[in-house]
Every structure is written in structure tokens, then in C-alpha cells.
Amino acid sequence: AAEYPGYLFAAVGIQPNSAAEANETDFAVIEDLAGYPGVRAIGETGLDCYWDDTPIEMQHDYFDRHMQLCRDTALPMVIHMRESGDLIVDQLKRQTNVPPGIMHSFTGDWECANSCLDLGLHVSFAGMVTFKKSDALRDVARRIPEDRLLVETDSPYLSPEPFRGKRPNEPARVEHTLRCLAEVRGVSAKALA
């Protein structure tokens, strides 16, 4: 972001799966980086109950710390969720002031999505929504208000159909995810873009 100002932007944070490897100095670096001009968000932060690389209590602590950093800097947060939607919503509801942000690569159910919307968050979908067995996720995407819906790659992972399993995922493939979302919403990709 510093090398290409105005063209490339950054999010800074300690991803939940990496929190066990982090220390106070690392978080201080994140706090410092958050003040750089090219930084536009804090994260990924959040919770991951799929991998057991970091104890859940430590993930909760870092999630709280990231949210406080968002409040201190007025930057939005990018929330990682993997098999942790209910825990994330519960933790967000305990906040007196939920920072703005996005539910990154959303995979939860409608109840979780609706709670996130009620908390003022945007909901973002990656290639997983295009997978054949993702009917329930597509139904959630269909119900998200257009002004709160985002489309992403989650590069280098989660390439959409017809590239599923091929890595690295890349920005050019987001078109396939967009087309899928447009189809389930009954609009053209151009209109949704």
C-alpha cells in the first residue's frame, strides 16, 4: 500500500489461527501499522472453530483487542468466521459499540446473517457460494439487502465454480461469484455490480 498509494490498500491484523504465535510486540506493530495512510481496515479478526491452532479464549481476546483498535482508529473490521457464527454474534452483542465492518467469506445461516445485519455489518460472499452443495448459502445471499452485500475472492483460496480446487484464486474469478449471486437474486450481473 505504501509503494502504490491510491492504487493498493491494506487491512492489518492478526488472523485468529495465528494469534497463538503472536505476542504483545506483534500487536503493537499492528497498532502502529493501523495509522499508515494506505491502511483501510483492521483484520482479519474474528473466530475460527475449525482449526485448533489457537485456543478459543485467546481468539476472543484478540477479537476484542482488534475491535477496540477499530474504535480507536475509526477503521472498519474484516471478520473471519469459520464454524463460529454464533460465538461471533454473541461476542459482538456484548460490545457497547460495534465497529462497522464486513463478515468476510460468509458461510453462516440466515439467523447468523440477520444478526450481523442488525449489528450494522456487511456480508461478503466468496467462491464457496457457487459450489453445487451450497444451496443454503445461496438462499442466505439471496436475502441480504443489496446495499449490505459484498462479493470477494478470498484469494488464494475458494476458487468459484468452474475453477473449484484450483489455486491460487485470483481477482478475475470474482466474476463467477458475482454471476451466481445475481442469478439467485433474479437480477443481471451488471445490475448487481
What kind of feature is each model-predicted range?
Residues 1-193:
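Mid-domain alpha/beta scaffold segments of enzyme catalytic cores
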